[in-house]
Amino acid sequence: MALPDFSMRQLLEAGIHFGHQTHRWNPKMAPYIYGARNNIHIIDLSQTVPLLHQALKQVSDTVAKGGRVLFVGTKRQASDIVADAAQRSAQYYVNSRWLGGMLTNWKTISNSIQRLRKLDEMLAGEAQGLTKKERLNLDREREKLDKALGGIKDMGSTPDLMFVIDTNKEAIAILEAKRLGIPVVAIIDSNCDPDKIDFPIPGNDDAARAIQLYCDLIAKAAIDGIARQQGALGVDIGASVEAPVEPALDPAPSTEAPQA
């Protein structure tokens, strides 16, 4: 396995170079802006390419060390894409609404996750002894909890890296990550503040094709990390399994010799 490849052409075709209207910009983004066309800022893809590669390496390295990546994208056009990419790469996601304290108050969130698990078990067992109304209420409670927490149900604890689409919309999530020292990989459009991001990726954060490309690449980087981790484990396991094989076989000829 290796880090996923991408080309400047792919970035262009996905519209990653299109920023927002010039009057909506954040001046801190000036170093990442190539110019303007028809009052739309054009993002400098010659900077996006190395920064995207750096972000992908960080994702792969984090997962290779056994770390967890949390995908965050709650805007309408990102929601399904984020969930699919996280599930495909055995990572975690928040794609409905960021609940305040999702990271900084993990203990409370854990209690809600336990409740979700309990509801899953109860309803899987057909909720015997419950009336239709009681079952309906449990179904609704489960649906609500699953929508909010289903993507982090199996995360176990706070993540080791966060990947964010739209830093303005997910400002609370980023703030919580910063408080806990969790590094953040994020797409920074022309109206974003790059200072808060550890691994910024300059690019459009609204177009569905752009979001699809980012998520696909991040997912592939995570899968690369999983392959590297398993490869490393395979070497260790192989060595430990092979070591006792020869001594175990040695006695065989000596026990047969007297019989011959």
Swiss-Prot record:
Record GO cellular component, one term: cytosolic small ribosomal subunit
Transmembrane segments annotated in the record for this chain: none
CDD domains on file: RPS2
One function term, GO molecular function aspect: structural constituent of ribosome
GO biological process: translation
Family matches, as InterPro entries: Ribosomal_uS2, Ribosomal_uS2_bac/mit/plastid, Ribosomal_uS2_CS, Ribosomal_uS2_flav_dom_sf
PROSITE patterns: RIBOSOMAL_S2_2
Ribonucleoprotein recorded as keyword: yes
UniProt keyword list: Ribonucleoprotein, Ribosomal protein
Superkingdom in the source lineage: Bacteria
Family: Belongs to the universal ribosomal protein uS2 family.
Protein name per Swiss-Prot or TrEMBL: Small ribosomal subunit protein uS2
Protein source organism: Mesorhizobium japonicum (strain LMG 29417 / CECT 9101 / MAFF 303099)
Phylogenetic placement of the source organism: Bacteria, Pseudomonadati, Pseudomonadota, Alphaproteobacteria, Hyphomicrobiales
Gene transcribed to yield this protein: rpsB
